[in-house]
């Protein structure tokens, strides 16, 4: 019976994740994942984007209370904007909460001034992430007082679906955008593994409001997907005793890996091929001097291969007992799960 694990173990697995922050801010990042099986870039990119934009926890202002104002179709004495405009501006305030319980913030201002989010008294548990965001314009000798309720949630919640069905008189519910991720885009490019050049490279661009860093947001999205997909694994995996298999060889099974599966430059790969170096075991038995005598093989190619071998605690000039084995092709196929 075909081993179930071959369904996923034979697929190439991503082994590089690179995070690149933009110099002007820590809230934007480019995340590069490679290599992926062809088609997996689009599959994972779309899934990650949808989760990032819909499912992460964040904080937002959910309601406001202004003295003598009972609904949004009113005007505030001394304030240039009407209540609807003020609410629209308040929806743009980005907040970060350090507790899970709701908090009430207070705003007091005396005109003439431009009232900004930075004027809100948040206390110790809430942080305003865009303090220069304009709320309204206040006329001379006029005062504005306001209470703002802040909560933790996820997604986008309409004021008509407020968490509290029975708000006190004078408290106005507003639409709340809890998601800390502001934008997500992705693209898929080709990447090279050995001599194969059409594997996928997934590049994700993420911007957050500062509540979480982009790399943390991506990690949370991946964890959410993992949790949701776990239920679909409705079979018991067969435990394979890889240790027994490995111990039956007098050398590391990694030496059975073909050199054309390494991420070598075209020049280096061609030199090895022309010199009939097929497996890593063939390669590590050569000394550095042997390699430099190979036609068209220079110091740059030597350093490239040394760097790759070092990742697996291998080097040139190794003594490999019983190499090459008589049934090397059969062994290479049998032990491929051990080195993939």
Curated annotation (Swiss-Prot):
Region (Alpha N-terminal domain (alpha-NTD)): 1-236
GO cellular component: cytoplasm; DNA-directed RNA polymerase complex
One MF annotation (Gene Ontology) recorded for this entry: DNA-directed RNA polymerase activity
EC number assigned by the record: 2.7.7.6
Alphabetical list of InterPro entries matching this protein: DNA-dir_RNA_pol_insert (IPR011262), DNA-dir_RNA_pol_RpoA/D/Rpb3 (IPR011263), DNA-dir_RpoA (IPR011773), RBP11-like (IPR036603), RNAP_asu_C (IPR011260), RNApol_insert_sf (IPR036643)
Pfam families, per database record: RNA_pol_A_bac, RNA_pol_A_CTD, RNA_pol_L
SUPFAM superfamilies per the UniProt record, alphabetical: C-terminal domain of RNA polymerase alpha subunit, Insert subdomain of RNA polymerase alpha subunit, RBP11-like subunits of RNA polymerase
Region described as Alpha C-terminal domain (alpha-CTD): 251-340
Keyword Transferase appears in the UniProt entry: yes
GO biological process per UniProt: DNA-templated transcription
Catalyzed reactions: RNA(n) + a ribonucleoside 5'-triphosphate = RNA(n+1) + diphosphate
Keyword Transcription in annotation: yes
Disulfide partners: none
Written domain comment of the UniProt record: The N-terminal domain is essential for RNAP assembly and basal transcription, whereas the C-terminal domain is involved in interaction with transcriptional regulators and with upstream promoter elements.
Physiological role: DNA-dependent RNA polymerase catalyzes the transcription of DNA into RNA using the four ribonucleoside triphosphates as substrates.
Subunit and interaction comment: Homodimer. The RNAP catalytic core consists of 2 alpha, 1 beta, 1 beta' and 1 omega subunit. When a sigma factor is associated with the core the holoenzyme is formed, which can initiate transcription.
Name of this protein: DNA-directed RNA polymerase subunit alpha
Gene: rpoA
């Amino acid at each position: 019976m075909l081993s179930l694990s071959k369904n996923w173990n034979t697929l190439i697995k991503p082994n590089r994740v690179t995070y690149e922050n933009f110099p002007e801010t820590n809230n934007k990042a480019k995340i590069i994942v490679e290599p992926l099986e062809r088609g997996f870039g689009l599959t994972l990119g779309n899934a990650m984007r949808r989760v990032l934009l819909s499912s992460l926890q964040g904080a937002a202002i959910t309601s406001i209370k202004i003295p003598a104002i009972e609904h949004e179709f009113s005007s505030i004495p001394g304030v240039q904007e009407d209540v609807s405009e003020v609410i629209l501006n308040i929806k743009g305030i980005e907040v970060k909460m350090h507790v899970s319980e709701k908090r009430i913030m207070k705003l007091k201002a005396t005109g003439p001034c431009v009232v900004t989010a930075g004027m809100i008294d948040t206390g110790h548990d809430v942080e305003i992430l865009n303090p220069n965001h304009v709320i309204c314009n206040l006329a001379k000798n006029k005062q504005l007082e306001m209470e703002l309720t802040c909560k933790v949630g996820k997604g986008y919640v309409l004021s008509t679906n407020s968490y509290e069905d029975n708000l006190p008189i004078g408290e106005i519910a507003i639409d709340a955008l809890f998601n800390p991720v502001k934008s997500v885009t992705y693209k898929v490019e080709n990447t090279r593994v050995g001599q194969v050049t059409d594997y996928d490279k997934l590049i994700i661009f993420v911007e957050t409001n500062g509540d979480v860093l982009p790399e943390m947001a991506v990690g949370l999205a991946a964890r959410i997907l993992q949790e949701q997909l776990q239920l679909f694994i409705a079979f018991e995996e067969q435990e394979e005793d890889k240790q027994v298999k490995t111990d039956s060889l007098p050398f590391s099974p990694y030496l059975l890996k073909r050199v054309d599966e390494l991420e070598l430059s075209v020049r280096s790969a061609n030199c090895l091929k022309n010199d009939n170096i097929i497996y890593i075991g063939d390669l590590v038995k050569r000394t550095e001097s042997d390699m430099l005598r190979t036609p068209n093989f220079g110091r740059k190619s030597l350093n490239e291969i040394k760097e790759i071998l070092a990742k697996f605690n291998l080097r040139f000039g190794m003594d490999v007992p019983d190499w090459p084995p008589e049934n090397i092709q059969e062994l290479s196929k049998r032990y491929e799960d051990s080195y993939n």
